[in-house]
């Protein structure tokens, strides 16, 4: 049996033994000692989290319209069928990923799913479900697992790019499925943050980003820089041919790079959706 430690060392023991041991790890960055005591009673692999890390959760959704005759994309007219998230730190390191397909919508609302913007991807979703890449389950189970991850990692902040949309559609879906018995998808008291606001404050003041947008015509009708996740990722990665996949977890993995990039600049920026 093996035990994975936060410092990435691996310790092996004979199966069935009860082992109590103490590991003292010297922090290279802060020169502090971290003591971890582990009791091992069975053949399991245990990952020990570093409690000094301020873990964050980045989430993304894909949706279908409730009323397909409504012009425009509004969270109040959207149900969530794809939810992906990752537990990360501010440097963008990933500690856990999740990818779920909401069976209540994906299977229960097949007619509406055919009007989803990315309906052509439905066959690929089924392939991913069969291969285990995505998990098909109820919205209630998805929410339960989210709450468990938040508790396990001590998460106090949830991020999305254009969080106003994801926050809205998740709540609309939650209220419809529970008949408004439960009105909010996220736990009470969690800080709701938006990488779009961060990017506008950080990249919006960078001459290099402005020049990049002008050079590639990534501008609004009024001539202002655009701040879509796809365009920002093209800038920070140097991959100007990058195309966003527009599935939950795949988009999360580029949005966490935006989060990390903004933090690396050490600039004053807004994070919270409502501030």
Regions found by a protein language model. Name each.
Residues 12, 23, 29-30, 35-41, ...:
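Short, positively charged and aromatic/hydrophobic N-terminal segments
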Residues 2, 17, 41-43:
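Basic polycationic patches enriched in arginine
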Residues 157-164, 168-169, 211-275:
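Acidic, Mg2+-coordinating catalytic module of metal-dependent nucleases/exonucleases
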């Amino acid at each position: 049996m093996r035990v994975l430690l936060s410092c990435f060392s691996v310790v092996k023991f004979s199966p069935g033994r009860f082992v109590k041991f103490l590991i003292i790890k010297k922090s290279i960055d802060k020169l502090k000692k971290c003591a971890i005591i582990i009791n091992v009673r069975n053949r399991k692999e245990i990952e020990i989290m570093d409690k000094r890390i301020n873990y964050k959760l980045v989430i993304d959704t894909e949706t279908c319209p409730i009323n397909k005759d409504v012009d425009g994309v509004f969270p109040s007219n959207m149900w969530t069928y794809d939810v992906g998230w990752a537990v990360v730190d501010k440097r963008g390191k990933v500690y856990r990923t999740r990818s779920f397909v909401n069976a209540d919508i994906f299977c229960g609302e097949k007619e509406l799913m055919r009007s989803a913007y990315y309906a052509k991807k439905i066959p690929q979703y089924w392939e991913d479900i069969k291969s285990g890449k995505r998990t098909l389950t109820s919205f209630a189970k998805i929410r339960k697992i989210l709450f468990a991850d938040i508790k396990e990692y001590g998460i106090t902040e949830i991020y999305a790019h254009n969080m106003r949309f994801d926050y809205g559609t998740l709540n609309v879906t939650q209220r419809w499925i529970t008949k408004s018995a439960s009105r909010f998808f996220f736990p009470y008291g969690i800080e709701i943050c938006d990488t779009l606001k961060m990017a506008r404050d950080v990249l919006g003041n960078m001459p290099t980003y402005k020049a990049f947008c002008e050079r590639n015509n990534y501008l609004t009708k009024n001539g202002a820089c655009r701040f879509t996740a796809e365009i920002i990722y093209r800038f920070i990665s140097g991959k100007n041919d990058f195309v966003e996949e527009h599935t939950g977890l795949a988009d999360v993995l580029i949005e966490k790079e935006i989060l990390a990039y903004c933090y690396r600049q050490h600039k004053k920026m807004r994070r919270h959706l409502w501030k």
